[in-house]
C-alpha cells in the first residue's frame, strides 16, 4: 500500500573544527543547522525509477527500495532544498536522509533509526568515497556533537554567548577531491592531521 505523496525532511550541518582529519580517526566538532532544511517528496510516476550510480539522491532511493524489496518502483522524487550544494554543509547527507524518509513514508513502511543510518551511509559512500560518517550523524542530530570515526560520538552542551558567522565565498568545495588530495600526501600529512586533532580536543575542552 502506498500514499499519494511520501514526504521526508532533514537539516544541514557545519563543521566547527576537525574537517578532513576526522576521516583519519581524529575528533571533529560539528553543529546541526536545524533551520536550514531540505524536503523530498516521492510521487507516482509512469515509468520505473532508474539508478544513476554517481548520484547521491539516486543511490539513497535505490538503497531504500532494495531494503524494502521493491522492484521496478514507478516513482519520482522532488527536492526542495535551502542547503547550498558543495559548501560543506552536508547537502548530500541531508538529501539522502530526506529521500530515504520520503520513500519509506510513501510505502508506509517503518524506518528504524539504525536502518536509516545504514542506508544514508551507503549513499554517502557514493558521494564522498571514504566518508567519516560525521555528516550523516550530525544531520540526524539536534545537538552539537564531537565525533570520532569508528568510535562514536558524544553530544555537547553548547551554551555560548557568541555568534558563528557562516559566509558563502561562492567557491564550490569538492569533498571527494579534497580527501584524495590529503591521501596523496601520505605520511607528510600526518603531523598536520595530528595537530588538528589536538586543536579539536582543546576546542572541546573550552566548550565544556
Predicted regions and their residues:
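Short pre-catalytic strand/loop immediately N-terminal to key active-site residues, enriched for Gly-Thr
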Residues: 75-87
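C-terminal nucleotide
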Residues: 2-17, 21-23, 30-34, 39-71, ...
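DPxDG-like acidic metal-binding loop motif
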Residues: 89-112
Amino acid at each position: 500500500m502506498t500514499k499519494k505523496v511520501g514526504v521526508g525532511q532533514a537539516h544541514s550541518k557545519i563543521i566547527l573544527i576537525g574537517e578532513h582529519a576526522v576521516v583519519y580517526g581524529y575528533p571533529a566538532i560539528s553543529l546541526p543547522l536545524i533551520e536550514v532544511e531540505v524536503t523530498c517528496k516521492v510521487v507516482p510516476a509512469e515509468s520505473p525509477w532508474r539508478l544513476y550510480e554517481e548520484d547521491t539522491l539516486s543511490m539513497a532511493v535505490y538503497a531504500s527500495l532494495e531494503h524494502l524489496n521493491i522492484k521496478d518502483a514507478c516513482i519520482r522524487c522532488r527536492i526542495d532544498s535551502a542547503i547550498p550544494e558543495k559548501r560543506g554543509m552536508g547537502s548530500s547527507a541531508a538529501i539522502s536522509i530526506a529521500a530515504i524518509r520520503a520513500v519509506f513514508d510513501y510505502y508506509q513502511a517503518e524506518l528504524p533509526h539504525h536502518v536509516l543510518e545504514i542506508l544514508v551511509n551507503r549513499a554517502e559512500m557514493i558521494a564522498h568515497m571514504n566518508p567519516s560518517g560525521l555528516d550523516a550523524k550530525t544531520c540526524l542530530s539536534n545537538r552539537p556533537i564531537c565525533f570520532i570515526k569508528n568510535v562514536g560520538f558524544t553530544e555537547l552542551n553548547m551554551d555560548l554567548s557568541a555568534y558563528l558567522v557562516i559566509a558563502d565565498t561562492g567557491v564550490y568545495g569538492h569533498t571527494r577531491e579534497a580527501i584524495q588530495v590529503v591521501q596523496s600526501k601520505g605520511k607528510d600529512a600526518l603531523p598536520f592531521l595530528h595537530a588538528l586533532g589536538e586543536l579539536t580536543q582543546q576546542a572541546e575542552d573550552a566548550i565544556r
